[in-house]
Amino acid sequence: MALGKNKRISKGGKRSKRGKAQETMARKEWYDVVAPANFEKRQFAKTICNKTQGTRIAADVLRGRVFEANLADLNQSAGEEEAYRKVRFTVQEVQGRNLLTQFHSMEVTTDKMASLLRKWCTTMETTVEVKTADGYTMRLFVVAFTKPQANQQSRNCYAKQRLVKWLRMRITKMIKRRLSKVQIKEAVSLLTRNVLSDALVRRCNPILPLRELRIRKVRVVRTPKFDAQALLSAHGTIPASVEADQREVEEAVEAAPAAEKAAE
C-alpha cells in the first residue's frame, strides 16, 4: 500500500535560508519631541523610529508626525486651569535626537464645551481666517454665550439678530487686526495665554453682556515654504538630549555579551 505525504511531518534536512531573527527594538531609536520656545516645558514627549537603512532615512519618516499635549503640562505655571485645552505640534526638522516642531492646532476638550452650554441664552459662533506676517494661514472658531443684564426681570437672555451680526463683525475685525501683524510665534502666545480672548471680551461686552467667550479651536490650514532659519529662531536654545546618549551606552553594554556568546 502506497503511503501519501504527511504534511504534519516536517523534513529534517530542509533548513531555513534566513538567519537568526533580530530583536525588533534593536532596529529602532528614541527621539525627544521639542516644543517652540514660547512654551515652558520644551521636551514634552518621546517617540520611536526605525534606524536609517539604505534609502529609508529616519529623518524623512519623522517629518510630518503630529504630537498632542495638554496645555497645562506645557505651561506648568498656569496650573490645572488650562487643562481643558489640547495643543498639537507637527515635526518640521530633525536635529540629532531632537525633533523640532511647529504649532499645528489647538482645541478645547469636549467635556469643557459641554459644561459651557446653558438654557435660556443665545449661543453665537463665528469662523475667522487670518494670515500672519510670516505667511501662516490660521482658522479660528470662536463661540460666545450671552448672560442676563443687570436688574433684568426676564428669565431668558436671548440676543437680537442685529446685535449678533454686530458682535460677529467686531470679533472678525479684531482678530484680523491683531494676528495679521505678528508672526506665528507671537500669535500662539496670544492664543495660549488668553490675551486675545480677554481683549475680545472687553470689546464685545458693550454690545452684549457675555457670560463666556472662548476660542474653541485653532487650525493652521496653510503654511509657507519651509525656512530652517525661522524655525531655529522660534526654538531659540534647544535643550540637550542627555537621555539619548545614555540609551546609546546601554545598547552598547547589552550588545557586548551577545557578541561574546556568538564568538564562542
Curated annotation (Swiss-Prot):
Q: Name one GO molecular function term.
A: structural constituent of ribosome
User: Which GO terms are recorded in the biological process aspect for this UniProt protein?
Assistant: translation
Q: Which keywords annotate this record? A: Cytoplasm, Ribonucleoprotein, Ribosomal protein
Extract one GO cellular component term from the record: cytosolic small ribosomal subunit
Tell me the InterPro entries matching this sequence: Ribosomal_eS1 (IPR001593), Ribosomal_eS1_euk (IPR027500)
Membrane-spanning residues: none
Bias (Basic residues) occurs at: 1-19
Chief localization class? cytoplasm
Q: Name one Pfam family in it.
A: Ribosomal_S3Ae
Spell out the subcellular localization from the entry: Cytoplasm
Family label = Belongs to the eukaryotic ribosomal protein eS1 family.
How would you summarize the oligomeric state and partners of this protein? Component of the small ribosomal subunit. Mature ribosomes consist of a small (40S) and a large (60S) subunit. The 40S subunit contains about 33 different proteins and 1 molecule of RNA (18S). The 60S subunit contains about 49 different proteins and 3 molecules of RNA (25S, 5.8S and 5S).
Give the matching PANTHER family: 40S RIBOSOMAL PROTEIN S3A
Put simply, this protein is called Small ribosomal subunit protein eS1A
Which species is listed as the source? Leishmania infantum
